[in-house]
Structure formats: C-alpha cells, structure tokens
Swiss-Prot record:
One of its GO terms (biological process) is protein stabilization. This is BAG domain-containing protein Samui. The keyword Chaperone applies. The lineage of its organism: Eukaryota, Metazoa, Ecdysozoa, Arthropoda, Hexapoda. GO terms for cellular component: cytosol; membrane; nucleus. It comes from Bombyx mori. Induction: By cold. Residues 262-276, 459-477 have a biased composition (Polar residues). PROSITE patterns: BAG (PS51035). Residues 104-129 have a biased composition (Low complexity).
Amino acid sequence: MESPVVLDKPPEYHGDRGFPFEEEEGSGAWSELAARHPDIAARLRQRPATWARKRRPSSNDATDDFGDNFSGFDRFPFDDIPPEFREHFPSHWNRRFSSRDEQPQQQTPASPTQPQQQTTATQTEQTPTHSEHEQQTQIPQYGLRNTVDLGQKSPADPSLVDADDRTHRSMSAPPDTPNQTKMSVHNHQEQTHQPHGETQSNVRHIPIFVEGRDKPVINKSVDHGTHFGEAKPQYVPPPPPPHVDRDQYFADDVNFHPPPNFSRSFGTPFNKTYRQGPQPFVQQKAYPQTAFARGASPQRSQSPKPTDEHFVKVPVHHETPKAEPPSRAQKSPQQHQPPPPKSPQQHQPPPPKSPQQQPPPQREQTPPQPKTQQPSSNDPITQILSIQTDVLNLMTDVENFTGTKKDKRYLFLDEMLTRNLIKLDNIETDGKENIRQARKEAIKCIQKCIAVLEAKADSSNQQRKAQPEQETQVQDECQSHDVDMKENTQNDQTTEIPAQPIVENGEVEMDEATKEKPAEPQTAAAVPPQTDNTEEANVEKQAVESAVAVEKDEKQEVVKVEAQEKSEEVKPEDANASGTVNPAETQPPAADTRPEDNKSTGGDAEKKEDKKSTPKKVTKTVKKRDKSKDKKDAPKDSNKEDKIEANSVLNPEPMPVDEKGDKTDSQVMDVDGAASQ
C-alpha cells in the first residue's frame, strides 16, 4: 500500500552537500543578493515569513512554490547565509529554524513531494532486499533502502517531463533530493539501533502512513547504521497527527508526476490496487513506468553515477519476499560497480532496481503460460478421443434400437449424439491438420449414427403402421366368415324345422323322417365343414332331434297300449250285445289288421331299435322324461279304468286326453281305432 511520507527533518548540508538547486537558488543566490544588493536583501529578509504565513494553509493544495519549499524544508543552510542576514532574521524564522524537530513536517511543500511520491514506493519496497545485501556484501553504500539511481530513468516517465532542468543540476550535485528528505524520518527512528558508519550520509527513513494504523510502517530489518552518524538522533520527532491528512491527500497523487490535478484524477484507481498488497507490479505493466523500467536496467550497468532525475515512481509494497531472491541475484553485481566514497550516490541505485523487480514477476508469469498451452495443445486430441468412445458406445445402442421416434430411447440417443457434435464444434484445431482430420472423422461417425438411428425409427414406424392394416384385414375376414357361419346355421335350422311336423304326421311319415334324419346330418356336416363351430352345432342339433324323436315314439307307444286296452274292453261288450256275430265280425278285421299291425309293429320295433340305438347318447333326458310321463300316465289309466267300470263309451274320451298332449297322438288314435274296428 502506497502512502506519502512526510519528512521530519531535512539534513543540514555543509560545503558541497546540499540540494541540487540550493547551490544556484539557495545559498549561492542569497549570498549574491546580499553582496550585490544589500537594500534588496533587507527587503528579502521579510519575504519568507510572509510566504510561510500565506502558503501554509494552501500547502495542502499542492500549489506551493519554491519559496514555501525552502521555508518548509528548511533548505537554507545557515552556514551558507552570511551572518549579517542571520542577525536580521524575523523572530518566527528563528523559532522555525530552532524547532526543526516540531514543524518541518507541517510545512512540507507539495511540488517537491509530488516527485517524491513517485520514488517512495519502490524505495520502501526494496528496503528488505538492500538491507540483506548490506549484510551479505558488506558494501554499506549500496545496501541503503532509499538509494536511487536516477540516471536510469527514460524520458518516457511522466515524472521527468516537468523536471528536465533538475536532471541537469543533479548531474553535478549530490542527490540530496526529496528522496533523501523523505527517507530521513524513517532512518532517524532506527539510528539508535544501527552501527556507526559514514557520518556524512544523507540517507533518511521514510515513515509510511497506512490507513487504519496510527504509526507509520517502518521496515525494521533494514540496517542503515553504517551510513549514518550518531550526531543526528535529535531529529527523530514523533509524527504529528495532522500528517495523516496530508498522507491521505498524497495517497491519491502517488503514481503520477507533479501536476496535482492529473495525479488526483488518475491516481485513485491505482491507490486502491496498491492498498491490496503485491498487486501493483502486475497492474502497472501497461503504463510507461514499465517501459522506462525495462530501458533502465541496461543503463544501470552503464552509468551507475547519479546523473538523472531524482524523482522516481515507487509503488509501496509491504510484502516483497517473493520478488527479493531474483532481485538479489540481479543487483548484487551492480551494487559493486559504483565506488564506495560516493556516499551521496547511495540514494540512487534502488529505482532501477525497482524496475528490475518488476520483470521477475513477469518472468514468473510467462513460464506458466507455455505450461497451460501444452495441455491445451493436448486437450483437443484427448477430447476427440473421449467423444469417439462415447459415440462408439452409443453406436451399439443405435444398432439395438427397435423403437420409433416417439420412444424415450430414441430421444436419448439423438440428444447424446447431438451433444457430442456440439463438443466437436467447440474444439479448436489451432491450425493443426491432425486435429482437423480427427474432428472430421468424429463428426462423420456421429452423423452416420444419427442417420442409422433415424432410418431404424422410420422403418419401425412403417412396420407398426403395416401391422394394424393387416390386423384390420384379418378382422374383416374373420367377421365375414362369422356372418357366413351364422347364415349357414340359420339356413340349417330352417331346413330342419319343417322336418319335425312331417315326423309327427303318422307312423308311415315317421319312417320317412327316420330315413331322412341320417341323411340330413350328413348334408349339414358336408355343407359347413369350414369351422368346428358348425360341426358342434350339428352334433347338438342331432342330439336334440333324437331326443324329440324318442319322446314321440314313447308317446305313440303309450297311446297304442291304451287303444288296445280300450279295444279289448269294447269287444266283450259288443259280443254280449250282438252275440257270436260280433266276434266273427271283429276277428276278420282283426286278422286283416294284425298283419298290418304286425307290419306296423315290426316297423315300429325297427324304429324303436334304431331310435334306441341313436338316443343312447341322451339317456339322462329320456329317463327323466320317462319318469314324468309315467307319472302322467298313471292317473290317466286310473281314470280310464273308472270309466270302463261305469260302462261308458270310452272312444271319445281319449281324444280330449290326447288333445291336452299332442295332436299327432289323436291322429294316431284315429288310425288305430279304424284299424281295430
């Protein structure tokens, strides 16, 4: 996280040491003015006080000029000012210069700090690496965390556009720039714990104010004691709270060159990224800082001297252990190049090292890219192989498929095949012929599978449509056959029904009926031989007809027996009435009728034998009916005997009895009576 740093106390410079512009604008300018124009010098003695009063409230607006800068940073070394001017300094000047530990931070100008803001990030970020190099290489000049080699900066850096004249001055003067002043506070806080080194060092610590913290962030691992003397522990005042506001103000301006409006408008998005930690290096690659960083690394090896701008963009980085090892390896040879006596140059090496730290993460990021490309180059082939295996598995299902397009199985297979097609479409060939050929073959295979599946579904649909047609045809044929069968059975019934009255019309007709009966079933059996139903119907009909015939024969026999009994009873009565003539008269007709009776009885016997042979199948019905008829006959016989005892004429009596039964019996009775008479 990057935040501006307010310096507690700028160093006092004696002789050659001082800010690059102090020689011209600072001590040299005052001395010349005092020598040439003493009256103007007296007038100028009061100007800094007025400037300080006027400019202090506006210093927060980053619009302070050099007048306020000199008063705020106390950049006028008293050694360079003639003593006559010191005597005439205003009282508030004396207070300000005497209490350097208290107020210099409140008077920090904006114009020099803006370029400083660009240097702080890399300086603070690289401190652990340089401190470790101090301990390893034991070259204290180059292990400073705040050393900045400003000769490495390219004109592409926006911070250099406004400071061309300063770069020329820095070529000749030691780098006692705001970089050094900002670093002062941070180093002063650690001077007590550090060993003695060069007392003339200009290195200063930079207290970095982080949001959410009350104290500035200080890298305690940095050992800068070799570069500082013990004569300056008094310059370590605690940072006053108003600096937090100024830090927050500068936090928006950290990334860009001095113009405050430009820094405010474009600095905020980068400050957000800096506050997140090690991200600034990755996110600043698109900006000219990286361009000058890459161009700066070769210049670092060529010109280790502080010949360029002192203001460098430095993204503050609190977590830099990952970037340290490559930076150490790269910077260790470079740190040995500049000679040790150049203590002021100790501030300048780090900025080119900050760009050198930026390429290592890039190098770390570039090797994973070919790693990702290698599996990606293998991915298309593996994907095509997996798709082909799936298609082969689906092909077996397609071959076994027998349903229609409405079946779920068909929908499933079609969906899976189309998904595999889509997968093949998403595969990139990357201009490789083998991948193209494999994809084409896989697509052709899937298309064939889909065609086979559709063909099978269509064929099964046609088969299912054909089957209902065949079934309807068969049903129609069966229905026509059934109609024919019904008609045949009805015709058979109509032909058989008139045969029954013929059988009922006398004994002679009974013979004809019996002779016709065996023929009729034969014809009936011959006419409808098509199905078994007709045969069964014929068998049933034959059984019913035989049963009816047996009943009729039994009735006829019973009637004949009754007629014979009546005739026998009538004959003695006639004999008693007519004498002998009646028996004689009765005998011849009896003799005449006997042969007929015998014939008829013989025919009846044959009929009975034939009928008994046929109705053996229906013995149950015959027995039941015989029993019932015997019961009916028993009262008839008893009534007839009663009537005979009463000597009544019995001939008309059996007629009504027979009328209750069948008409055929009455006719038979008449015939028998005529024959008996």
